[in-house]
Swiss-Prot record:
Residues 5-71 form the J domain. This is Chaperone protein DnaJ. It is found in: Cytoplasm. Participates actively in the response to hyperosmotic and heat shock by preventing the aggregation of stress-denatured proteins and by disaggregating proteins, also in an autonomous, DnaK-independent fashion. Unfolded proteins bind initially to DnaJ; upon interaction with the DnaJ-bound protein, DnaK hydrolyzes its bound ATP, resulting in the formation of a stable complex. GrpE releases ADP from DnaK; ATP binding to DnaK triggers the release of the substrate protein, thus completing the reaction cycle. Zn(2+) 2 binds at residues 162, 165, 184, 187. Homodimer. Belongs to the DnaJ family. GO terms for molecular function: ATP binding; heat shock protein binding; unfolded protein binding; zinc ion binding.
Amino acid sequence: MADKDLYAILGVCRTANQDEIKKAYRKLSMKWHPDRNPNNKEEAEEKFKEINKAYEILSDSQKRASYDRFGFDAANQGAAGGGFSGGNFSDIFGDVFGDIFGNVRQTNGARQTRGHDLAYKIELSLEEAIHGVEKQIRIATQVRCGECHGSGMNAKSKKKTCPTCNGAGQVRMQQGFFSIAQPCPTCHGRGEIIENPCNKCQGTGRVKDTRVLTVNIPAGVDNGDRIRLSGEGEAGELGAPAGDLYIEIFVRAHPIFERQGNDLYCKMPISFTTACLGGDLEVPTLNGRVKLSIPEETQTGKTFRLKGKGVQSVRSNSVGDLYCTVTIETPINLSKAQKELLMNFEQALNEGGKTHTPQAKGFFDNIKQFFDNL
């Protein structure tokens, strides 16, 4: 699925509204339902799964936004931002095909609604990402009601069968030739209602509040990584399971290092004299300074590898390397005497017939040959 266009699967454009998406989904679902394709069941099942998954994501505004921005994996795992719904696709399936195929999905009576998954973006420095850190976050969400402990009831409450759906949790609406099942608007699919519900949560078993969580970020995480905290999302209705919380990692740009996988890269300026004569330099790493020996006649762009000075993988014990690329700085703010010394130095280089600038000589030799061949 990750390499397929969900809009193309449903046959709609990227600007399609929800009515167009729903209409396309219903048409394709009826066409490719396995029960309607007994002679081609394997292909129909595969198509039907794709259609279902495409509709699950594109019918949810937050998942759709996540898909448009980050792609299939982000939308499918619920890592878009702010908060989002995991959804229950079996409900959609039952709504569309409940009557057509003999009520494929049976209603479970008093149905509980799992809490939505939530997402939270944490911004880290490179040092925090590499060494790990403990972060405290605040999330405004639905939490279990402390008054009724999630039951939605108080001492005077009692449950009774929903008079609208007679306990089925669904009502049916006629649309043309089809009877479409939808969650009961009175009991919201639970099949029963609470008389004299909890005053604090109004019978839902949950209330809006701000939670404070301490999150342990493991060492070695990288930009775009996601951490799943099971059961730390939105509280479910009437004691139903809570959703999950997804922590999405964003690592700020570092003034010295650039990270690629488990390797680190940096650009290290050296003086003209050090490039010519060589010397020892102190190189910064995320674990302190180390000595790097620069050989004589080092050219700009030369890269030195410091093994094991990169990042330890969050998924294994392997450690990356640090790559230092040198750039030779041209002296500035020269005095008259210094300029004269450089001119004398240049004249000395031209004596004796030796080549001191092989790259320049090769470049200009190629230019001469180019014009000679015109």
